[in-house]
Amino acid sequence: PDIKGCSRTDAGVHALGFKLNFHADTRIPAAKFPLALNQHLPPDIRVLDAQVVPEDFHARYAAHTKTYLYRIHNSPIDSPFDEKYYTRVPRRLDTAKMNTAARRFVGKHDFLALCAAGSSAAAHGDTVRTITACGVERKGDEVEITVTADGYLYNMVRILAGTLCEVGAGRMQPEAIPGILASRDRHKAGPTLPAKGLFLKSVEYD
């Protein structure tokens, strides 16, 4: 079938709530689709729910906002059971400063400074996005960065997370964020963190 996914995630990125749609000419009720499909899927992919949607629905273009989660293991020692699902930062991060910086990203801005080279959107000058929520939370040795926006540029969340880590490590001040965005210069922002710590958390529809 013609499968329409909600997002084009980079290799190595995980998903907690990926949405897709396809046309199914079947009498099987939607409620039974998860059990039926899961019998044929690899163990690291699971269908959690299925719903009937209008014929013209598109999982990507109908999305109102998408929320991403970036996981950081803030410890000098790795957690062997979770190593594939976070990026380790050994130096203690100041999450209060990171939260102050995170709030500076909220709003409608030109995010070219948080866009990796090779972006088709950047090539067409389409770099304005609206972040509706951005926050940082510590849970023991884990630091979670959560971002909700109406759209994202290439590697935008990974660069945003890298920039917040620079703030948390004391190498950058929260007050620098507006200037970084205004500069439209990728070199002013922080590093691109590895894909393995990034999760598509949820997709919201009207």
Regions found by a protein language model. Name each.
Residues P1-D206:
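Structured-RNA-binding interfaces characteristic of tRNA pseudouridine synthases
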